[in-house]
Amino acid sequence: MTFNVEFHPKAAKEAKDMLRMNLELNYDFRQYLEELAEEPYKFPKKKGKLKSCRALYFKVKGNAWRLIFRIIDARDLVEIVAIGPHEDAYSSAVKRL
């Protein structure tokens, strides 16, 4: 089954800003989104306040970044909640849930 992928409005802005920062990431990012749509359950579950979420790890200019998302099975949906450097992504995700 393929899931639809949607962005929280603020996560969409974070994605645009990230891609502006690093244009070479465009192809990789599209691949990440396809992977989320095809196999969202393969990514690790989070704990604590983000226990309903999972995370995809990747690098931007050598720095660790996170794409935090949740799966809404009833709608066959993957909602991207936050994207950013490690700590920023997690704190933003907590505020948006």
Regions found by a protein language model. Give the residues of each.
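Enriched for short, Lys/Arg-rich terminal
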Residues: N4, F58-R66, R70-L97
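Residues that form or immediately flank small-molecule/cofactor binding pockets and catalytic motifs
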Residues: K10, K51, P85
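Arg/Lys-rich, positively charged N-terminal/basic patches that mediate binding to nucleic acids
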Residues: M1-Y32
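Short linear functional motifs in flexible/disordered or boundary regions
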Residues: L23, Y27, Y41, E79-V81, ...
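A short, surface-exposed loop/turn module that caps and links secondary-structure elements
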Residues: E34-K61
